[in-house]
Amino acid sequence: ADTIVAVELDTYPNTDIGDPNYPHIGIDIKSIRSKKIAKWNMQDGKVATAHIIYNSVGKRLSAVVSYPNADSATVSYDVDLDNVLPEWVRVGLSATTGLYKETNTILSWSFTSKLKSNSTAETNALHFTFNQFTKDQKDLILQGDATTDSDGNLQLTRVSSDGTPQGNSVGRALFYAPVHIWESSAVVASFDATFTFLIKSPDSDPADGITFFISNMDSTIPSGSGGRLLGLFPDAN
């Protein structure tokens, strides 16, 4: 099975797998059952920003999701990613819809990782920024239903030609280049990721959510990982 660390922006409460009964953000370590969650006042049809940071000194993974002129949702969890993830990984975004649906539209995405080996050595960094997405985005690996549209957005799940979200869809987008996420000799390993997104739903209950995830390099969408499993995990264990 894949090794996954993720921050989930979960719009649908699947209480049978440990979700609270409201939209929430959560930190997932190798399981869809979040280690830590925080309530999230999801706003339909408004652009939001998600910001995720990790630093190996504090060994804390944190996420903030915010809308303009509104309170932010914040969640953090203490974890040593050296013990969880392989040394080389890929970073991606995933989303799903189920019986209920929503648009899972990504408008921009940036990521920076740094490895500092000692006080004299240079920092080894990887950085990318997408302020918009092109029709044939060669530096992204698109999986499942993920596509880039003519408006310069990344649609992680299926939408019809008039922009209506479709149910039972799963899609992911990974940056093509592997990321050196940790190294035994590194003094500090850190990363931060930011993406802006728009969730819009014709349903009273939107579903299912968006994640930022880090995985082994050859990760693919697991069979049966639609809906509540957010395109990341084969089961709810």
From Swiss-Prot:
Family: Belongs to the leguminous lectin family.
Listed InterPro entries: ConA-like_dom_sf (IPR013320), Lectin_LegA_CS (IPR000985), Lectin_legB_Mn/Ca_BS (IPR019825), Legume_lectin_dom (IPR001220), Leguminous_Lectin (IPR050258)
Residue sites binding Mn(2+) per the record: E8, D10, D19, H24
CDD domains: lectin_legume_LecRK_Arcelin_ConA
Other notes: Binds one manganese (or other transition metal) ion and one calcium ion. The metal ions are essential for the saccharide-binding and cell-agglutinating activities.
Record note on quaternary structure: Homotetramer; dimer of dimers.
Pfam families the record matches: Lectin_legB
Function: Lectin. Induces paw edema in mice. Has a weak vasorelaxant effect on rat aorta. Has anti-inflammatory and anti-nociceptive effects.
GO molecular function, one term: D-mannose binding
Protein name: Lectin ConGF
Keywords: Calcium, Lectin, Manganese, Mannose-binding, Metal-binding
PANTHER family the UniProt entry points to: CONCANAVALIN A-LIKE LECTIN FAMILY PROTEIN, LEGUME LECTIN DOMAIN-CONTAINING PROTEIN
PTM entry text: Concanavalin A-like lectins of the Diocleinae subtribe undergo proteolytic processing referred to as circular permutation. The propeptide is split into an N-terminal and a C-terminal part, the gamma and beta chain, respectively. These are then religated in beta-gamma order to form the mature alpha chain. The beta and gamma chains can often be detected in cell extracts. Residues 1-118 of the mature chain, as displayed here, probably constitute the beta chain in the propeptide, residues 119-237 the gamma chain.
Gene source species: Canavalia grandiflora
